[in-house]
Every structure is written in C-alpha cells, then in structure tokens.
C-alpha cells in the first residue's frame, strides 16, 4: 500500500515537473515572438536603434513581466521602461504592437477586424507616417481588416476606404471621403 502511494507520488511529481517545463518553454516562445513583433514596430516607426525587451520573473509563485526599451546611441546603450523612453509616442506604438501580437498569438484565433480609436495620438508628426505604414504592413501581412477612428490625415491616407463622419443637427452623417 505504501509502495503504491510512493509510486503515485513520484508519478505526480514527474507530471508537475513536465507541466512546469512545458509552461516555461511556452512562456519563453511567447516572449521571443512578442519581442520580435514589437521591436519590428518600433524599428518601422523610429529607426533601427531601438529594441523591445521583456523580462520575466517569478514573484510569489507567479510569473510577472517587465517591459523595457533598449536604445543605442553610438557606443552607448540605454535601457528604460517604455513610459520613460522618449515620450508617449513610444508607449502608443508598443501598445499598438502588443494588441496586434495578442490578437495573432491567441488560440483559437480571434477573428474579425482590428478596431482602433486614435491609435497614435502621442506620436509626433515626424513619426506618424511610420505608424501608418506599420499598420498597413501588419494588417496586410495578417490579412486583418483595420477599422480606425482618427483625426490624423497621414493615418487615413493608407486606408483603402475613408469615411467622413459629421454631426449635423444631432445626427451622424457618413459620407465617402476622397482627398482633394
């Protein structure tokens, strides 16, 4: 009887170790894929001197993630939290790329469009064109429709269709928009 309990205990311990190793492997794969996608987004918008890093750590038996932006300035490498790196535009681009990464990584796949409301409101004029091209590239790459609400003309210029919505006498009037 005791021997059977010991064997069962050993088996359960082996199963626990297997599940733990599998979980660690899956977390590492997800971390790498997300880092790559977000880094590509940052490079697309801000240039090749920037990377996105995720640091995973165990805290009270739970895995937590910290995000960092790693920038290269000549021989100097600076690693900061996104909210501390070069302003709010970085946070907007990271947020956008993380949403896309989560949509693509989730199983079963989440179908339907990517719906965005002013996705790059803190990105400066200098970089907004890069955000527009990034969105176009990734929506084309993942065959995902993008429905976006924006006041930014550069973002709307990469759209296949643009609609102007105006409030007139308490009613929303929707008309196809063509640039002049």
Where are the regions that the model predicts?
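Charged, surface-exposed helical/loop "interaction arms" that form contiguous linear patches used
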Residues: 1-56
């Amino acid at each position: 009887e005791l021997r059977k309990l010991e064997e069962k205990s050993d088996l359960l311990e082996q199963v626990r170790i297997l599940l733990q190793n599998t979980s660690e492997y899956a977390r590492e794969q997800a971390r790498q894929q997300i880092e790559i996608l977000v880094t590509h987004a940052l490079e697309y918008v801000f240039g090749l001197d920037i990377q996105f890093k995720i640091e995973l750590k165990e805290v009270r038996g739970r895995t937590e993630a910290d995000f960092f932006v790693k920038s290269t300035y000549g021989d100097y490498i600076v690693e900061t939290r996104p909210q501390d790196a070069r302003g709010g535009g970085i946070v907007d681009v990271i947020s956008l790329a993380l949403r896309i990464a989560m949509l693509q990584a989730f199983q079963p796949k989440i179908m339907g469009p990517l719906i965005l409301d002013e996705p790059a409101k803190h990105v400066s004029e200098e970089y907004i064109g890069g955000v527009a091209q990034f969105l176009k590239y990734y929506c084309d790459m993942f065959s995902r429709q993008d429905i976006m609400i924006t006041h930014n003309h550069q973002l709307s210029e990469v759209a296949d269709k643009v609609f102007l919505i105006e409030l007139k006498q308490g009613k929303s009037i929707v008309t196809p928009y063509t640039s002049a």
